[in-house]
Amino acid sequence: MEIKEYEEKYAKGMSEIIRDNLYTINIKDYGKEVIDKIARHFTEEEIQKNFPERVKCFVALKDEKVIGTASLDLIKDMYGIKIEDNKDKYIILTVFIKKENQHQGVGTKLIEKIEKYACEIGAKELIIPASIYGCEFYKKMGYDYYNGIKELNKDGEYVLSKKMIKEM
């Protein structure tokens, strides 16, 4: 397995993985109506249009096929509150692993890659809106509930964070 930066040619594979996870795993916690709204943002075309604007997006590849994805973006607002002049808080988005490759370290490698890159660009804190299904994974990766509060936000996600320590 290797981790590479996003290229347009990976959009189709990313879309398939994300939408498959949404409709087979996340649907159990959120229902079809919510998943339908979310899934619209993850067609191949939407990924090609929106993902290049993110600070960084990585894909995990096995035999040149996408088996996972994760991306990083600067936080511009936090649930409707504009964050002006933010230069050091970033948000981890769209972490999805192909079902048959879950629990094999792919997600861990992607998060480690995101964290390393975040440190390199001066991030002081990473925020992640985690699905109910993914919450325990991020806890194992050293993330804790934002401001110590374990509650679902308006989107049905737990918000977790991790302070970054720049490695020497």
Feature locations, PLM:
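A short helix-loop-beta-strand connector motif used in the catalytic cores of GNAT acetyltransferases and
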Residues: T43-V59, I91
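A short beta-loop-alpha structural element at the N-terminal edge
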Residues: E2-E16
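Conserved GNAT-fold acetyl-CoA-binding loop/helix
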Residues: R19-E46
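Conserved beta-strand in the GNAT
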Residues: V59, K65-L74, G80, I91-F96
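Conserved acetyl-CoA-binding loop-helix of GNAT-fold acetyltransferases
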Residues: T94-I97, H103-K116
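C-terminal "cap" of GNAT-fold acetyltransferases
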Residues: K124-C135, M141, E151-M168
